[in-house]
Design a protein with these regions (language model features):
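Histidine/acidic residue-rich metal-binding segments in metalloenzymes
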Residues: 1-133
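Divalent metal-coordination and catalytic microenvironments
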Residues: 138-139
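Short glycine/threonine-rich loop-to-helix capping motif typified by GTGT followed
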Residues: 144-150
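C-terminal, non-catalytic macromolecule-binding modules
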Residues: 151-154, 162
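Generic long, charged, amphipathic alpha-helical segments
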Residues: 161-171
């Protein structure tokens, strides 16, 4: 949701030194600036994480390619079924008490939102000073399968490779 970075920032501030781990923070690091009202809030979040030693995070890095979204929020999965790629998905309800949904999804490097999500994750990894407080994750399978970890590690460790990849995505 564009603008959700404010909730993340307020959550960190509101903890007032209590220890906390924030999961899949890339999905909660969106600003609402720019022509499309969708931007990165990673720098602000990384700055606050760096200033609050009580906070650890995992990134939930988006990687380009095929994955699936899996969630117990079957109503959200139902609402997102039009994004299914390929156009097959499943959603089930168990006596109105519980449910789940699985929607196949393809993150595309030429899609503005997907490219920005990818960049926000990398930005977060690279701006948090203490590597022991930022965990390498893709929110498997939602951001990408864990099998993309070698590619992600290369993106983080090889600046020229990262720059080459940046040249190929949606500007």
């Amino acid at each position: 949701v564009p603008g959700n970075k404010d909730t993340t920032l307020n959550t960190i501030r509101g903890l007032e030194g209590l220890p906390a781990h924030l999961t899949h923070i890339q999905f909660h690091s969106y600003g609402n600036e720019g022509d499309f009202k969708f931007s990165s809030g990673a720098a602000e979040i990384a700055e606050l994480v760096n200033a609050n030693k009580n906070i650890s995070i995992d990134v939930g890095q988006v990687m380009f390619g095929q994955t699936v979204t899996a969630s117990g929020d079957n109503m959200r999965q139902f609402a997102n079924n039009h994004h299914a790629d390929p156009k097959k998905w499943v959603c089930m309800d168990i006596e109105c008490d519980a449910g789940c949904g699985v929607v196949p999804f393809r993150y595309k490097d030429q899609n503005f939102v997907n490219a920005l999500q990818w960049a926000i994750g990398l930005e977060t990894f690279l701006l948090v000073d203490d590597p022991w407080r930022v965990f390498l994750t893709t929110d498997h399978p939602n951001g990408a399968p864990f099998t993309t970890y070698p590619h992600l590690i290369r993106l983080l460790m090889d600046k020229s490779f990262r720059q080459d990849m940046l040249q190929t995505i949606n500007p």
